[in-house]
Amino acid sequence: NGNAMSSGSNTAGDKDNLYIFPYDLSNDGGNTRRAKNQYLGSVFGLAWQRESRVLFMSAYLKRHSGFGPGGIGAIYQSQISTTGVPATPTLLVNVGTIGINVGTDPRITALPNDPKTPNTDVGVFAEIGKRGIGGIDISNDGKDLYIVNMFEKKLHRINIGNPLKSSFTATDV
């Protein structure tokens, strides 16, 4: 809840966002926090490129929860080591920069920095599921990332390469 890009203790940006846990976990206490909200904001889609051990996460329009640094069209990446410890998530690509129109952020009021502060976020309510990125998935060979564009109601394929490319252009779509 709140402005994901806020900084300082006890702000929305300081709250936990990404957790990992062992595959064979059988009791409580095995999950580990790996990222704060300020690095990701609201995310929904997840995809795993096993060869490079990269977890992809897509931004998601959600009421009362702001976007991370990449905005509405962001796809983030986090390298997960063999010990399960990921690197801090970073922006892989904002799909708007490679020709995919997922719409704009419909927020008409700023979200509060304090996650306990009530807010109305009225501009978002009617647009959930109509703007931004929905689910994401990766091809079996790990070379293509598929994204659901809820704004244009399309499925897009992005050639991300395997091993993972470091930059993308419209020709990768």
Predicted regions span which residues?
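Sequence/structural signature of beta-propeller domains
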Residues: N1-V173
